[in-house]
Amino acid sequence: MVTVFDAVSDRAQRVRHPEKAHRPDTEVLRKPDWIRVKAPTSKGYQETRSIVKSHKLVTVCEEAGCPNIGECWDKKHATFMIMGEICTRACAFCNVATGKPNALDLDEPANVAKAVKQMGLSHVVITSVDRDDLDDGGAEHFEKVIFAIREASPETTIEILTPDFLRKPGALERVVAAKPDVINHNLETVPSNYLTVRPGARYFHSIRLLQRVKELDPTMFTKSGIMVGLGEERNEVLQLMDDLRTADVDFLTIGQYLQPSRKHHKVEKFVTPEEFKSYETVAYTKGFLMVSSSPLTRSSHHAGDDFARLKAARERKLAAAE
């Protein structure tokens, strides 16, 4: 995740996506004051970076260009991205490189577990690129990473942010059986945007995936997130909330889409903090246990603190029902 500046960074200007090379440049809008963040320079940031590099790990923080990297890494929080740094999908919003992935690193589960222990993480988030090239979409690798972390750091809670495992029968079941504490799968945007923003995915397949998690394990916490500013209408966001509640999703995150480069989908609108607060208020009335809605909200931002609040919210709900 790179720091957000007014100009597109040199890194963002490099075309990491061959499929986007033919696209015309889109205008990169000047970011409003409420989205400015400082460049990461702290000692904690440098220490986290050193640990990540020493174990030859990939983080979505760097690969996706997250604006919160300075804050998170200063606190020694990081989201590990497993199964390589090359994705088989070509989403119009994403800065992760697209192409033919390398073979899985068989040492990665152990290396992630070592890093988690070295960083002293009480809560860790594990995500991945899409691996449509693998028969199980990478489900077994997720399982191995979860087991390795459990063995090395049994007190650490584990949150996984999964791909959709489209056309990978049995993959989700294997991941749920590995017993992470939270399963997150992001819808990313409203269904009317899928053909242009997330063409390799299917909106209702993602809804069904989240619903299936609860069928397999009703006690599992589920989570999903979207970006706004991609041209969606407010009523579409509210309908998406209803779809997620139909799937009994516990936690919703809503953040501002930020354009990684001129070859990516343009920012149609910078949603104001007041509008984000309104979304949060409505989402709580629809029954979500937890909602995080702000311009800089990201799926794994403050994930550890949010998990503690999520557990407390469920306990209050259960107590009220007695």
UniProtKB/Swiss-Prot annotation:
Which Pfam families does its entry note? LIAS_N (PF16881), Radical_SAM (PF04055)
Pathway given in the UniProt record: Protein modification; protein lipoylation via endogenous pathway; protein N(6)-(lipoyl)lysine from octanoyl-[acyl-carrier-protein]: step 2/2
Kindly report the protein's main subcellular placement as a broad class: cytoplasm
Alphabetically sorted, this entry's keywords are: 4Fe-4S, Cytoplasm, Iron, Iron-sulfur, Metal-binding, S-adenosyl-L-methionine, Transferase
Record-listed [4Fe-4S] cluster 1 binding positions: C61, C66, C72, S300
Q: EC number(s) for this protein?
A: 2.8.1.8
GO CC annotation: what is one? cytoplasm
The entry's free-text remark on the cofactor is:
Binds 2 [4Fe-4S] clusters per subunit. One cluster is coordinated with 3 cysteines and an exchangeable S-adenosyl-L-methionine.
Q: Name one GO molecular function term.
A: lipoate synthase activity
Matches recorded under SUPFAM superfamilies: Radical SAM enzymes (SSF102114)
Subcellular localization is given as: Cytoplasm
Domain of life, source organism: Bacteria
Q: Which cofactor does it need?
A: [4Fe-4S] cluster
| Catalyzed chemical reaction(s) | [[Fe-S] cluster scaffold protein carrying a second [4Fe-4S](2+) cluster] + N(6)-octanoyl-L-lysyl-[protein] + 2 oxidized [2Fe-2S]-[ferredoxin] + 2 S-adenosyl-L-methionine + 4 H(+) = [[Fe-S] cluster scaffold protein] + N(6)-[(R)-dihydrolipoyl]-L-lysyl-[protein] + 4 Fe(3+) + 2 hydrogen sulfide + 2 5'-deoxyadenosine + 2 L-methionine + 2 reduced [2Fe-2S]-[ferredoxin]
Q: State the Gene3D superfamilies in the record.
A: Aldolase class I
Question: Binding positions for [4Fe-4S] cluster 2?
Answer: C87, C91, C94
Annotated Radical SAM core domain residues = 73-289
By sequence similarity, the record places it as follows: Belongs to the radical SAM superfamily. Lipoyl synthase family.
Identification of the protein by name: Lipoyl synthase
From which organism does this entry originate? Rhizobium meliloti (strain 1021)
- Gene giving rise to this polypeptide: lipA
